[in-house]
């Protein structure tokens, strides 16, 4: 702005000097030049018109004044034309300066936009690198989740296999329990039959006792009665002991069976609870698998979005690279334009220097003209010499005018070229402004896209944070479930060991029950054999008792007592089932002497049955 003001002041000063010079020239120099010309003309044509003193006549003066007026008018017109040219040049200079400032501001704005664009590109590159790093972390987390999912699948398969094995073992235990229950029922049925047989035998023994009591026993047989009573008491005690032992065995066996059934029920309950827990765990694992699948779907969508964003970022980088190339070209063009402007400024400076030199010459000429006018006003006598000098000066002025015309033509050509260049520059600047507007629009859209991408990235980061929190919770749940499954495995292993131990015990008890059943069966068989033997012995005893035991001189021959063999037979039938005891059954004794029973001898035949061995019954006579 200061340079423009100084230039305007200089131009105003030069214009003022030109006007003053032309006014002074029209007043003095022009008249002198015309007078000299007229003098020359008159001097050559009519020498009588001159006076003796060398002065002009009034007519010459009037002609000179008219010529001076015409020359003054022509010089004034020429001065106005020069002034207009100077004003046009000044206007063009101001336009060029304004364009220069506009170009400088546009260049500065373009440099700022390029700097901002470069910063945005660096920021985008940093965000892209961060997004790549985040995508890598997501990929690693996804691979870890897939590995964890595979481990969970393997663990679930192992648990399902163990559950199937446990269910099979439970089914086997249930089957064995059913078999044991059936065998226990059979044994209880057999025991019930044995107890019924035992009760029948006891009833039969009681009937025999009743018959023995109803029988008439002679008084002298005190020893036999006492022995019989002792035997009965012993038999009763043995029967009571056997009943107590049998009842105790049955009670213990029933308690064992009840305990086993209770244990089996508890085991079934525990297995049902474990199956329920396994089902709940499977449901949880299924839910976790569903969540994992949803998370994988979300991760896949996020990867797709990241891929799209990377594609957009790559396109934006390509656009930025193209824009940078365009900006480089524009900077080159701006550099060329600046170079042209510098050249134009140099030319303008040269032109100003030439104008300054011309002004100095004009000042010198004005000074010279002033001195000449002063000399012409003071010395009219030296007019002829001065006319020659003025002719030379006019020649110089003509040459200067020719130079000025040439300079004006050069300035017009230069101004035309500059106007063309300025038109081209304005067209280029307009195009650049349009491109910059498009670039600004693209940058605005890119900034909006980047804002949306940042919002999406922020949401994705929040989602990933939530997913990481869920994954951490799931890992904790998986750890707890693994611990629970480990505890359950340990419990199942212990239960399997307990079941195996119980199964072994059940098998041992089953074998013992089989042995007891075999013993009972053998006892029943032995009882049956004993009954048969007792029947045979009764027959043999009847045969033997039908004959006299002593000589007939001492005992009567009539031994056919009606109640003599019935107690023995009944005693044989009601023989006790215990093979470890020996029961003695006594037949009713004979007469005390032969006088009471005249049919018998002096001594009676009293047979006693006792068990000597396990399989033999001996008979002695008293």
UniProtKB/Swiss-Prot annotation:
Please name the Pfam families in this protein's record.
Answer: GM130_C
> What InterPro entries does this protein map onto?
GM130_C, GOLGA6L
Q: What is this protein called?
A: Golgin subfamily A member 6-like protein 7
Query: Which gene name belongs to this protein?
Result: GOLGA6L7
| Stretches with biased composition (Acidic residues) | 477-489
The record's annotation in PANTHER family points to: GOLGIN SUBFAMILY A MEMBER 6-LIKE PROTEIN 2 (PTHR23143:SF28), TRICHOHYALIN-RELATED (PTHR23143)
Organism whose genome encodes this protein:
Homo sapiens (Human)
Q: Origin, by domain of life?
A: Eukaryota
Q: Where is the composition biased (Basic and acidic residues)?
A: 57-74, 251-275, 283-332, 339-367, 374-388, 395-420, 511-546, 567-580
Which Gene Ontology cellular component terms are annotated? Answer: cis-Golgi network
Q: Which residues form a coiled coil?
A: 100-534
Keywords in alphabetical order: Coiled coil
Q: What family is it from? A: Belongs to the GOLGA6 family.
Q: Where is this region: Disordered?
A: 1-82, 251-496, 511-580
The signal peptide, as residue positions, is: none
């Amino acid at each position: 702005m200061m340079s423009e003001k100084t230039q305007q002041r200089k131009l105003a000063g030069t214009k003022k000097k030109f006007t003053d010079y032309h006014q002074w020239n029209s007043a003095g120099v022009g008249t002198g030049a015309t007078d000299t010309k007229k003098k020359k003309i008159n001097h050559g044509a009519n020498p009588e018109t001159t006076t003796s003193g060398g002065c002009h006549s009034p007519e010459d003066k009037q002609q000179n004044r008219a010529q001076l007026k015409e020359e003054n008018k022509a010089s004034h017109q020429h001065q106005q034309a020069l002034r207009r040219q100077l004003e046009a040049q000044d206007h063009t200079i101001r336009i060029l300066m304004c364009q220069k400032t506009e170009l400088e501001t546009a260049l500065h704005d373009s440099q700022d936009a390029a700097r901002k664009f470069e910063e945005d590109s660096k920021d985008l590159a940093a965000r892209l690198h961060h997004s790549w790093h985040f995508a890598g972390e997501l990929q690693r987390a996804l691979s870890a989740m897939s590995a964890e999912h595979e481990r969970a699948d393997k663990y679930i398969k192992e648990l399902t296999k163990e559950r199937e094995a446990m269910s099979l073992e439970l089914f086997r235990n249930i089957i064995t329990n059913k078999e044991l229950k059936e065998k226990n029922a059979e044994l209880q049925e057999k025991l019930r039959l044995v107890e019924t047989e035992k009760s029948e035998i006891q009833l039969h023994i009681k009937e025999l006792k009743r018959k023995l009591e109803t029988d008439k026993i002679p008084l002298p047989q005190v020893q036999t009665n006492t022995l019989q009573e002792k035997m009965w008491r012993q038999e009763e005690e043995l029967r009571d002991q056997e009943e107590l032992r049998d009842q105790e065995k049955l009670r213990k066996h029933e308690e064992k069976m009840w305990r086993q059934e209770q244990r089996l029920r508890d085991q079934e309950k525990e297995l049902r609870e474990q199956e329920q827990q396994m089902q709940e765990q499977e449901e949880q694992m299924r839910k976790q698998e569903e969540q994992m699948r949803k998370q994988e779907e979300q991760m896949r969508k996020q990867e797709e979005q990241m891929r799209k964003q990377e594609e957009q970022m790559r396109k934006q980088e390509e656009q930025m690279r193209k824009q940078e190339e365009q900006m480089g070209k524009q900077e080159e063009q701006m550099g060329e334009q600046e170079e042209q402007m510098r050249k134009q400024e140099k030319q303008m400076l040269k032109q100003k220097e030439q104008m300054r030199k011309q002004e100095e010459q004009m000042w010198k000429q004005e000074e010279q003209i002033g001195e000449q006018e002063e000399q012409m006003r003071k010395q009219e006598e030296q007019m002829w010499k001065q006319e020659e000098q003025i002719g030379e000066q006019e020649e110089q002025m003509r040459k200067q005018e020719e130079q000025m015309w040439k300079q004006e033509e050069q300035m017009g050509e230069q101004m035309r070229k500059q106007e063309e260049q300025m038109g081209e520059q304005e067209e280029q600047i307009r195009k650049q402004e349009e491109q910059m507007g498009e670039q600004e629009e693209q940058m605005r859209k890119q900034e909006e896209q980047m804002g949306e991408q940042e919002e999406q990235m922020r949401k994705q980061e929040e989602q990933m944070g939530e997913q990481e929190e869920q994954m951490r919770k799931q890992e904790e749940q998986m750890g707890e479930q693994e611990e629970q499954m480990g505890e359950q495995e340990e419990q199942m292993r212990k239960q399997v060991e307990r079941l195996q131990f119980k199964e072994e015990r059940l098998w041992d008890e089953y074998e013992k029950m089989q042995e007891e059943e075999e013993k009972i069966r053998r006892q029943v068989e032995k009882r049956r054999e004993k009954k048969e033997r007792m029947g045979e012995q009764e027959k043999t005893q009847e045969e033997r008792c039908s004959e006299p035991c002593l000589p007939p001189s001492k005992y009567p021959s009539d031994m056919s007592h009606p109640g003599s063999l019935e107690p023995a037979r009944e005693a044989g039938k009601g023989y006790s089932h215990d093979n470890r005891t020996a029961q003695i059954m006594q037949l009713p004794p004979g007469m005390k002497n032969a006088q009471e029973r005249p049919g018998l001898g002096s001594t009676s035949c009293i047979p006693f049955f006792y068990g000597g061995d396990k399989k033999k019954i001996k008979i002695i006579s008293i």
